[in-house]
Amino acid sequence: MNFLAHLHLAHLAESSLSGNLLADFVRGNPEESFPPDVVAGIHMHRRIDVLTDNLPEVREAREWFRSETRRVAPITLDVMWDHFLSRHWSQLSPDFPLQEFVCYAREQVMTILPDSPPRFINLNNYLWSEQWLVRYRDMDFIQNVLNGMASRRPRLDALRDSWYDLDAHYAALETRFWQFYPRMMAQASRKAL
């Protein structure tokens, strides 16, 4: 899962949106550095990552990547799941329009920004103003996201080419998303994530 899915599942679970978004920027035990609700959100994010990576649908989808891009398949798929969530938001969350959810999520996250790591602050400088969560529905933007990550981290250069795997398996990936994401939403609503 990437930013949008983590925020969405956190909302459904009544967990800290801030902690769920912050988690990828925190190493080790967060309990010394953040309030308990944010710590709980960080731990939820980590559980979701482990759960998602081990779902049969996700493991199967990783196998569809070519040998030269398979190493970055988990990252590419995380971004792709956000594409499908953004694209189908009105079906999955009909009572909370995506633009309203993004404003709500931003308000939640801004509360912890002053005490956050510099890389997280930098992310927030772009995430909200450039409307990433809404733009995820556009595959051209997904390609830009993958290229941007590859540019910032040369060892992830294969992300550029992973775009072709997404394009080749788009319909099958969308089917897999519909198989597992509603289950995860139900788990989040039951606070079972």
UniProtKB/Swiss-Prot annotation:
Belongs to the AcpH family. It catalyses: holo-[ACP] + H2O = apo-[ACP] + (R)-4'-phosphopantetheine + H(+). HAMAP family: AcpH. This is Acyl carrier protein phosphodiesterase. The keyword Membrane does not apply. The keyword Lipid metabolism applies. GO terms for biological process: fatty acid biosynthetic process. InterPro entries: ACP_PD, ACP_phosphodiesterase_gpbac. It comes from Escherichia coli O157:H7. Keywords: Fatty acid biosynthesis, Fatty acid metabolism, Hydrolase, Lipid biosynthesis, Lipid metabolism. Converts holo-ACP to apo-ACP by hydrolytic cleavage of the phosphopantetheine prosthetic group from ACP. It comes from the Bacteria. Pfam families: ACP_PD. Its EC number is 3.1.4.14. NCBIfam families: PRK10045.1. GO terms for molecular function: [acyl-carrier-protein] phosphodiesterase activity. The gene is acpH.
